[in-house]
Amino acid sequence: MAEYVNYVLGSLYVSDTATSTIPTDVRNFIAPPFPLNFWSGPTFTVSSNTRADPLKLVAARHRAAAAAIDTLEAQSQYGVANVDALIRPLERQVAKVADALAALEDAARAAESADAATPQVNASEADQRPDNIGQSLSEIQIAKNDVPMEFDTNLAVDLLATVFVSRAAGGSNGVVFGTWYRALQDRLVTERPVATRSIDYRDGRMSKTFMTTAVVSLQSCGRLYIGNRPYSAFEAAVLCLHLAHRAVNSNYTYPTSFSGLIEQLPVYIEAFSTALGDGTLGKVGYEFNGARLPKNQFHVPGGGGRYERGALNGHGVLETLIRLKVLPAIPGSLGTTSTAVGPELDADQTAYIDDVNKAAAAFLVRAQNLFLTEDQTLLRSTINTITALLLLRRLLWNGNVYTDRLRNNFQLGAIVPNLAVSQRDARGASGGDAAAMVSRSGNNNFTFLCERYVSPIYIANREVELTQLFPGLAALCLDAQTVARDQPQHRAVNVSTGRNQTNLTRLIGIELENRRRTAPVPINEVLAAHDAVALQYERGLGLLMQKPRLRASLEETRRLGQFNVASDYDLLYFVCLGYIPSLTSAM
């Protein structure tokens, strides 16, 4: 019976329901019990609380939104605190950088004028100055027809500051120094932009900071920075020239002080120049044996006292000093220490007697030995100093400083304030005065320089070297590589100055970078740059001394014109200062 269902018309088999017709009847509706209160539920009837439900929903949503806003605000405040903690140090660093950049901008803008300003001292203040301040100033005179000048520590640097101050008084920076310095500054800006952040080269102007660094770098060409030596190369050179003069002149009254020896340098140089030619059959050489010298290094390697044997051979100045017995033979050139020099080479057995040490004791009295052959770095620098003095004599020979002043690019009256020049001192102010002075000056200008310029500076600074006295001479020697490339029959004028001064540009860049960096450039890099410039200066000395017509060659190739040198008067000031300023009108 479980398989049958009772319907109104009778019983049917369940399996036959697909083909059977079942009449509609309540008894035939197979479904679960239907809810009795279904049609009276809330879906089909309106409740009295219908209006309150949306308000509750809105209130719930409002509370949820308020809670979300509170959470978001708390999170934002926490994030702001964290961001502030991270950004505050960065903001402080950025502020410091901005202040530093602003200070550098102001310094670069004002360095050309305000930083160079020196306080003007009137007559009443000058009378009230302490005695020690007045004594610290050195008085020198370069040209005979100019008044003496006083300076503090460095004439070239002090006068350079005065040049920019005098031009900045009119609210302009129109000062130029020739194409050589222009090319040098442009090359520095291109190759070492970091070093040029502290200089003002806007609108093509020449920077005072750059010019000061360049002049100081030129003055350092002949200085020795490794080792502690009681004597300078300039002092050793003066003593050697004095002894050489004594060797060729028996009847001569000599001074008793070292400053007196300096004033006699023109006489000594004249006699030494004659001795150079007398002892040489062929052409005098002014270069060492470069194959035996250390590469890219001026000092003796390893801190020793001697170069490789034969490294200093071939230089006419050294050979003349040995021939005149001013210097003893170079150690090792006459035999070893175990073998004595034979009588056939040294009859008097005086080959190793050093008169330079005796002269240093007599004139300088420092209780320190001076054996140049034992300190061959100092010997090399001494030979270069004597060669530079010979070159200076040739440059200034027969110079006429009494020509028309309007032909000179250097006008001292436009630079030095309150310059009262009397009629007696203003000779050469017109062409008529120059026509009255047609006689040759010979060595007079060099003699005047030694008496009124070199000697006072040496008295003020006993450690001064020749390149510090004559930075312009060093500039000409550094430029000599350009002159050497000109063939005798080559008529083109070489104006490619910048590419020949890579070493000097590097040294200037290092000096400028050291002024800005908290951690300076390593000392080895500084010494390498200095040695490169010193070696280039040494090669330039040899190249210029080989020129048979030195002045004519420099003028024909416009090597003097690139330094603003237009006359003998300009050349005299150029070798002493290292530059010739020209004041230009503002554009």
Swiss-Prot record:
It is found in: Virion; Host nucleus. Residues 113-132 are annotated as: Disordered. GO terms for biological process: symbiont entry into host cell; viral genome packaging; viral penetration into host nucleus. Disulfide bonds: none annotated. Its main location: virion. Keywords: Capsid protein, Host nucleus, Host-virus interaction, Viral genome packaging, Viral penetration into host nucleus, Viral release from host cell, Virion, Virus entry into host cell. One of its GO terms (cellular component) is host cell nucleus. Residues 1-53 are annotated as: Interaction with major capsid protein/MCP. Belongs to the herpesviridae CVC2 protein family. Heterodimerizes with CVC1. Interacts with major capsid protein/MCP and triplex capsid protein 1/TRX1 at the pentamer vertices. Interacts with the large tegument protein/LTP. Capsid vertex-specific component that plays a role during viral DNA encapsidation, assuring correct genome cleavage and presumably stabilizing capsids that contain full-length viral genomes. Participates in the interaction between the capsid and the tegument through interaction with the large tegument protein/LTP. This is Capsid vertex component 2. It comes from Equine herpesvirus 1 (strain Ab4p). The lineage of its organism: Viruses, Duplodnaviria, Heunggongvirae, Peploviricota, Herviviricetes. The gene is CVC2.
